[in-house]
Amino acid sequence: MRKSVQDLQSMKSNKERIVALTAYDFQTASIIDSYCDFILVGDSLGNVFKGEETTLGVTVDDMIYHGLSVSRGVKNAHLCIDMPFMSYQSSSAEALKNAGRIIKATKAQSVKLEISFDTIPTIQKLANAGIPVVAHVGLCPQSYNVYGGYKKQGKTKTNQDYILTLSKEAEKNGASVVVIEG
């Protein structure tokens, strides 16, 4: 049986390490499943599989295709699928439609969103619909054009405070897990 968000939260409470890796295909997922607590199907497949410079060209259909392949190889780890660029930013209703489609098609346990304060209502909407949300803060590759590339985050006290405040707000509004990327 796959790990639930409650299992991950219990591990955190018990100060256990959570091993998380990324997979894009059945074979990789099958190999790493017994060594991981959390497997992400990342929109980084745009870089790794499609040879693109950024993750911005990845579609919901791409995520479903790779998510389903990975899902077939995951028996124990928690499976999380990235919500690609512009699949959740336009409205909470659009986010719910796309997240529901991803969860139903891939049998994943959660979806991951790169968040800002603007996406907090979307986290609430998904959580209220029974879709566990992993909130991604800090270096968010979907903001590539905003930052002028992949720029390290959290270098200043102001940026550190922003990331911490955003993380707490996400958790308060229904995010099951928060991932911080530097």
Place the predicted regions along the sequence by residue.
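Alpha/beta enzyme core
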Residues: 2-182
